[in-house]
Structures are given as C-alpha cells and as structure tokens.
Regions:
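Cytosolic, long alpha-helical scaffolding segments
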Residues: 1-254
C-alpha cells in the first residue's frame, strides 16, 4: 500500500511538471509563430519553423516516454486514479499536438517554395508518426483502464517480470530518438537497435501465446488478452520510432 502511494505521488508530480511545461510551450509558440508570420525573410522563417518542428517532436517524445512509464506502473499497481487522470492527459496532449501541427502547416507557406516542397513530405511523415505514438498510448491505456475499473484479475507476476525490462528498453530507445532530434546519433546503429528490440518483443508475444494456450484457469483469459495488447502496442511504438527516426534525419538535412 505504501509503495502504491509513492508511485501515485511520483506520477502526480510528473503530471504537474508536464502541465507547467505545456503552459510555457504555448507562450513560446505564440512568440515564434508571430515572427514566422510577420517576417519577409524566407530563410529566417524556415530556420524558425524547422527549429519549432524539431522542438515539437522532442517534446512529444518526452511526453510519450513519461506517459508510457506512468501507464505501465499504474496498471501493474492497479491504480485506477492514475490511469483515469493519464487518460485525460493523453487526450489533451493529442489535441495540443494537433494544434501545433496546424500552425506548422501554416508556417510552411511562409518559407521558400522549393524548401517547402522538399520539407513537406518528411514533415508529414514525422508528425504523422509522432501522432501515432500518442494514439498507441491511448489504444493501450483504454482497455487497461476498463480492466481495472471492473476489478478483474491483476497482471500476473511472470508478465510483470517480462514487460518491465522491455519497457525500460523502449524508454531508452525513445531517449536515443530524442538525442537524434536535438543533436545527432548514428542513425544506422539506432535503426538496427530498434529492429533488434522489435524481435525481442515479438519473441515475448510468441511466449505469451504459448502461455495462454497452456493456461488452465479461465479467469485469467481477460488479463492475458490485455497483456497481449500491451505487447502489441509496445512493438508498434518501436516500429513507429523507426519511421520517425528516418523522417527526422531527412528533415534535419534540409
């Protein structure tokens, strides 16, 4: 019980930090886009817009990293309050990102036409994949929240011991992706690491299918299906990171 309380407090602190960060980002956005709209210098407009796109993607990766960890720990600890609050937070984040993306699309009209055409494709691929990370969080959270709300069986210990190391590796990949956005990493090595991770998650899914086949207790069926969806969305998030990394690398080269 004490451990659950500590987890809830830590998640609440993280949530408040994210709220304060978003408030600061909104003020910064207004200033940046005001300059993009008013400047006649197309190179300046592109520099501002490119920096904003990279910053926006970085911010969302940071959000996804924290939210995924909060989700998993909230689910493992059957923390209904945390999952409910996180569900609202993810919904709001999705709308916040859509608003910033619409501004960025408008900003593309202010840069040189050739640059806009070159950047447009990679911009849309990058932002679409960033959106998919947020959607993955929502898809995996909703059934887990319903599961806890209905007081079904908790996640078995063997599943917890399996998913936690996989979750840690995913957040590590997200951090490396953030480094790719802000500075630079070896793209080829990063993509290979993601591919290796996807194989690891696929192996976990295969083991879990065998686990379900051998399970004698029918009361565990629902939690096993939920766990399979967690593994599937974890795999999907890694795959999305791979596509996002390629698009970000192309954008940074322009």
């Amino acid at each position: 019980m004490v451990a659950l309380g500590i987890v809830a407090i830590l998640i609440l602190i993280n949530s408040n930090r994210r709220y304060n960060k978003k408030a600061k980002e909104e003020k910064k956005d207004d200033k940046i886009f005001s300059e993009i709209v008013t400047t006649d210098d197309k190179e300046r407009a592109w520099a501002l817009l490119k920096g904003h796109v990279e910053g926006n993607i970085f911010s969302e990766l940071e959000f996804v990293e924290g939210a995924y960890t909060d989700f998993l720990e909230g689910f493992i600890n059957e923390d209904r309050r945390t999952l409910t609050k996180l569900y609202r937070t993810i919904r709001n984040e999705k709308e916040f990102f859509k608003t910033k993306r619409r501004k960025e699309i408008t900003g593309l009209k202010k840069v040189d036409t050739v640059v806009a055409v070159q950047a447009g494709t990679w911009f849309h691929i990058a932002t679409n994949n960033t959106s998919q990370l947020i959607y993955s969080l929502r898809r995996v959270l909703e059934p887990c929240k319903d599961h806890i709300d209905n007081n079904f069986n908790p996640l078995p210990q063997d599943c917890i011991e399996e998913i936690r190391p996989l979750a840690a590796k995913l957040t590590d990949l997200i951090e490396k992706e953030m480094n790719l956005v802000k500075t630079s990493v070896d793209l080829s090595a990063h993509l290979k690491e993601i591919s290796a991770y996807k194989k690891e998650v696929s192996a976990a899914m295969e083991r879990h299918i065998n686990r379900m086949r051998s399970e004698q207790d029918s009361s565990n069926l629902n939690i096993y299906i939920i766990y399979q969806s967690i593994l599937q969305e974890t795999w999907q998030m890694a795959d999305t990171l791979k596509h996002l990394a390629r698009a970000v690398d192309k954008l940074k080269s322009l």
